[in-house]
From Swiss-Prot:
<feature type="active site" description="Nucleophile; methyl group acceptor">
    <location>
        <position position="141"/>
    </location>
</feature>
<comment type="similarity">
    <text>Belongs to the MGMT family.</text>
</comment>
<dbReference type="InterPro" id="IPR036217">
    <property type="entry name" value="MethylDNA_cys_MeTrfase_DNAb"/>
</dbReference>
<keyword id="KW-0489">Methyltransferase</keyword>
<keyword id="KW-0227">DNA damage</keyword>
<dbReference type="Pfam" id="PF09153">
    <property type="entry name" value="MGMT_N"/>
</dbReference>
<comment type="function">
    <text>Involved in the cellular defense against the biological effects of O6-methylguanine (O6-MeG) and O4-methylthymine (O4-MeT) in DNA. Repairs the methylated nucleobase in DNA by stoichiometrically transferring the methyl group to a cysteine residue in the enzyme. This is a suicide reaction: the enzyme is irreversibly inactivated.</text>
</comment>
<dbReference type="InterPro" id="IPR036388">
    <property type="entry name" value="WH-like_DNA-bd_sf"/>
</dbReference>
<dbReference type="GO" id="GO:0006307">
    <property type="term" value="P:DNA alkylation repair"/>
</dbReference>
<keyword id="KW-0808">Transferase</keyword>
<dbReference type="InterPro" id="IPR036631">
    <property type="entry name" value="MGMT_N_sf"/>
</dbReference>
<dbReference type="GO" id="GO:0005737">
    <property type="term" value="C:cytoplasm"/>
</dbReference>
<dbReference type="InterPro" id="IPR015236">
    <property type="entry name" value="MGMT_N"/>
</dbReference>
<keyword id="KW-0234">DNA repair</keyword>
<protein>
    <recommendedName>
        <fullName>Methylated-DNA--protein-cysteine methyltransferase</fullName>
        <ecNumber>2.1.1.63</ecNumber>
    </recommendedName>
</protein>
<dbReference type="GO" id="GO:0032259">
    <property type="term" value="P:methylation"/>
</dbReference>
<dbReference type="InterPro" id="IPR001497">
    <property type="entry name" value="MethylDNA_cys_MeTrfase_AS"/>
</dbReference>
Amino acid sequence: MLSVEKFRVGERVVWIGVIFSGRVQGIAFAFDRGTLMKRIHDLAEHLGKRGVSISLDVQPSDYPEKVFKVLIGELDNASFLRELSFEGVTPFEKKVYEWLTKNVKRGSVITYGDLAKALNTSPRAVGGAMKRNPYPIVVPCHRVVAHDGIGYYSSGIEEKKFLLEIEGVKEWTS
């Protein structure tokens, strides 16, 4: 199922779409509905390739509102972990997502290298897991930055800056 809602954060419109079947299978967000729908279809395709059965039939749910509450800081990221299905996610990716969500709190960042050290792996492996994160905002991949700048973000650098600024992050270099 798919549930989509539009929210406002200050002057910015934010669209949030959640794919679910019992639990959350994937999350997408964008600043306009057209981009959101493209991201939802890309996410559904990615999950489908990983063996996840997806339905994009529209059905209202409270999931977009909950993701929005995480976005604006009214709901802690880690408290939302139990809502995620982790279908189509490798054991390594799940480990990375859970560690990041539980340990890198709102308003802070961690470098790819430091996250890799914490998990005894390589920065490249961490970067790959971040790129494939099906739960943006909730699993805060936007909080993972390069040692010399903001780094990459699948949804776009403008979106990453927006998320960090909402959380009060002023600088993202070490």
